[in-house]
Design a protein with these regions (language model features):
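Short solvent-exposed loop/turn micro-motifs enriched in small/polar/acidic residues
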Residues: 76-80, 112
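Short beta-strand scaffold segments in enzyme catalytic cores
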Residues: 84-87, 117-119
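Signature of lipid phosphatidyltransferase scaffolds
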Residues: 92-159
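Structural motif
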Residues: 11, 91-92
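Generic beta-sheet signal
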Residues: 50-52, 78, 88, 95-96, ...
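Conserved beta-strand segments of alpha/beta enzyme cores
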Residues: 72-74, 142
């Protein structure tokens, strides 16, 4: 999944309950995942991120190292998000249990990684359902009736 992210051409949509200062392999180096994302944005890729809670200080430090992220990363915080998905160029989708963390998709050692399961497919009906679920949250379709509005700083709706 991480290797596929680096090759996205136009659209990358990521949904995760938890996000941390994830590190990944890039060529022969280990780099912050946010460096990979910043490179995509520099190439003109639209990157959308939905996550459920504010990341910790290490993530924020990495985020601040790449100024393009503050300007062009499209981001929504929704405390009700528990899905984990990555949509690649609106043609392929990963849906599974792995959060955007070292133990989920990153480089934690074999003895410390989580046991994850997921599906990576380009089956049109599966990808369409993933896109629809992502859009449902992204567009604020549930916000008006949501019981957790007070915890949601990014709702697109004004109450």
């Amino acid at each position: 999944v991480i290797a596929k992210i680096a090759n996205v051409k136009h659209h990358l949509w990521i949904g995760t309950a938890d996000i941390k200062d994830l590190y990944v392999k890039s060529s022969s180096m280990t780099v912050p995942f946010l460096k990979v994302i910043s490179r995509l944005i520099e190439r003109g890729v639209e990157v959308r991120l939905i996550h459920a809670k504010e990341p910790g200080p290490n993530f924020r430090k990495d985020f601040d190292d790449y100024s393009i992220l503050a300007k062009r990363l499209e981001r929504v915080l929704c405390p009700r998000v528990h899905f984990k998905m990555v949509i690649f160029d609106l043609e392929t989708a990963y849906v599974g249990s792995a959060n955007l963390t070292g133990a989920g998709l990153g480089m934690k050692g074999e003895r410390n990684r989580n046991f994850e399961a997921g599906v990576l497919t380009n089956a049109p009906s599966f990808v369409e359902q993933a896109i629809n679920q992502f859009d449902f949250v992204w567009n604020g379709s549930q916000c008006k009736k949501c019981g957790r509005k007070r915890f949601c700083p990014d709702s697109p709706l004004k109450y």
